[in-house]
Structures are given as C-alpha cells and as structure tokens.
C-alpha cells in the first residue's frame, strides 16, 4: 500500500484511514448512528428483558433513563478527543498507551467486535431462516446441522448476510453514513406499524408494561432498579468505547452532543416503549409471549407484511453490525500495521475471522462465551477509566496530533520503546479484579457492576501511577 506520508509521520503509524479526516457529519448522522446501534434484534430482546425484572413500569423507566443518561455522558466524554483530532479510537489510544502500546487496547476491542460480529450475523440469519421456512416449509430437510455444526440452510443464511454486510462496508465510510441515515428510520416505521397492528388485534386493555409474573417491592425493587441501570450502561459499553471512530467525522462537539441526546435517551426510551407494547401484545394475539421480533413478524397472516418486517430487521442487524462490530476492528487491525493493512483490509480480516470462530458453536456453548467474551469484556471498563483520566486529567484535553504518528524516541507519545508501561500497569490489576468478579461465585452479586468497578479502578490506578512517575503531558501550545 503506497501513499504520500506527511512530513515527520512514520509508515509504522500512519495510513490515510488512520490520519485526520474531513469533518462533515452533522448531529443527525450521530443520531442515525445510535438508531442503528439500538434498533436490532439484540436491542429489542434487551429492551424487553428490562420490563421482565419484576419492576413496576415507572421503575423500569427510571432505570432506563438513569442508565442511558450515564451512557450519554460517557459518549460525550469519549467523543471529544477523536472529534478534536479527527482520528479514530486506536490512534487516540496512543495518548495513554504510547504509539505502539495502543495496539493493546485496539486489539482487545477488535477481538470482542469480531466475536460479536459473528454472533449477531448468526442470530439474524437464524431468524431469517424462520421466515424462509414460513414460505418454503419443504426446505426444513436442509435445516438439520451438517457441516461444522451448521445446516445447509444455516450456511446459506449466514453467508448471505455476511456478503451483504461486507458489501456495505466495502463501499466506504460515506456509504456507511448514507446507509445508517435511513436504516434507523426504516426500522422505526416497521415497528410503529407492527405495534399498531398488535394493539388493534389485542386491544389496548390487554397491553401491559410489565412482562414478568413476579412483582418486587421495597428494597428488592430498589436494588433491581440499580441493577437495571448498570445493565443499560454495560450493554452500550462496547460501541461507546470506540465511539471516536465516528465522532471524528463530526463538525463540532455541539453536533456530537445534540446527536447523542436524540440518539440515546430520546431514541432508546421510545424504542423500549414500542418494544414492550409489541412483546406484551404477542401473548393475547398469538397465545405466547414472543421476544424475537422476526419470530413475531413471521406469525402475521400476511406474506407482504412478513417480507417487509424481515427486510426491516435484517437491515437493522446489518446496521448495528457495521457500526458496532465492523468499523471498529477495521481501524483496530489497521492500527497494528498501517503500511500493510488498510481500513478495508482490516475490516475483511475481521469478517473472515468471524467465520472461522464458528459463532453458532460459540453462541450455543454458554460456558465458552463465559470464558472468552467475558474475560475480554473485563478489559473494557478499565480501558474507559484509563483513556478518560489520561485525556481529561493528565493531558488536560491537549493533543499533539502530529506526535500521534511520530515513532522517533524523542516523540511526545513514544514513552519507553513506544509503550507507556504506566497504562499497562494500571490496566492489568483493574482487569484482574473484573475477571475475579465474573468468575468467583461469592462475588456474583457484583457481576452486573463489573464495568463500573473496572472503570473506577483503571482510572484510579492510572492517575496514581502517572502522577507518581510524572508522565509527560503535552504543552499548552498544541491543538486543543
């Protein structure tokens, strides 16, 4: 990959995809980004699950609002350095971890994204097969597991979605922006129509905003509200960590904050309310409560409605997979060897890897997920803490953009051999605490708060170590 290097930039740190980009995105593009992230089969199931915790509807709404407002605050904080420097998440990681040490947080996030990319694609393809069998029941013979644990029909569905997602990604960030700009509203339109149909069939009197037979009260209810709040924050932690991959394109932080407001508290609350109306109504309409939107659509006695509904939710899955699990590893893997791996090549590495991990086997083995994804996820909280403390408290919101691409020993972010060992020292113990919480039965009560624990400890350890070791901060003269 040959391209003109700006003066002083190292080919080991720079390619055009990682360098500063034109900033043309408006608040609506950020709003659409969050719509694509929220409007998915996974988001639908997650939103419905919050109303099945045994809480009164107003208690669930309090938890929803509290959790999503925390996410909004974090997203605003994470967005600023990337918007300020117009560079993606792995490049911003060089501030805290060093120009080469940044590969540690980048690869961690990339591996998590690869696994979830495969799982999301598999889940969407499985739901799509339900629709296919609705129209072609004779194909059920091809739905039995055959090769590598997946059926012929399963492979057809998985690879079809895989190719569709790869095609959208390959077209570039501008095409991705255009795709997510309309994908979110399309899903909303289908959901509103579906909710209206459900209410018409079930009757408003049969719609309940509580999806659980149990009912909590007193301190039990209060504790569950806190748990629900933590679950919301944890659910959004992945895409929020690499939100800079998108905020880098935004015209201003004012646009980012406005887009985050409409895309997070307003959008998530509206989506959750429509979701619970649909899920609640499936019981009187179909005789059982359905938590999968495509399964719900497939039960409608209208072929055109089934096709439109399936199209909308497949579109939603493509949207979330691209914004949360495709763009991220593309930048992350390109950051490892910029002169050899372009953004497109990084994305295709992730896409191909998602096949070889056979996500259907991973998803169907909860113990395997527990020992792989949960360990990787234990890194996310500490990474938030370290990156935010470094930018806001250590570096005082100052970034020397040119130094982010300088691998000379005198470079501002070169530290020790290109690695800031202070950040690594802070990351490891904070992560070990998260792993201990996840895998120690006696600490299971804290498992839902692992993100908060990791974020606090990662930030605290880094702050103490950085001040003790007097890590250099950029001078006031650099861009801020």
Which stretches of residues belong to each language-model region?
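Membrane-interface loop-to-helix entry segments
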Residues: 108, 119-125, 156-198, 211, ...
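Membrane-interface "cap" regions at the ends of multi-pass membrane proteins
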Residues: 1-57, 72, 191-201, 216-229, ...
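C-terminal membrane-solvent junction of multi-pass transporters and transport-like membrane proteins
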Residues: 17, 21, 383-464, 468, ...
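Hydrophobic, membrane-embedded alpha-helices of multi-pass small-molecule transporters
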Residues: 27-44, 157-164, 195-202, 213-278, ...
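Selective recognition of specific alpha-helical transmembrane segments in multi-pass small-molecule
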Residues: 42, 66-74, 108-120, 185-200, ...
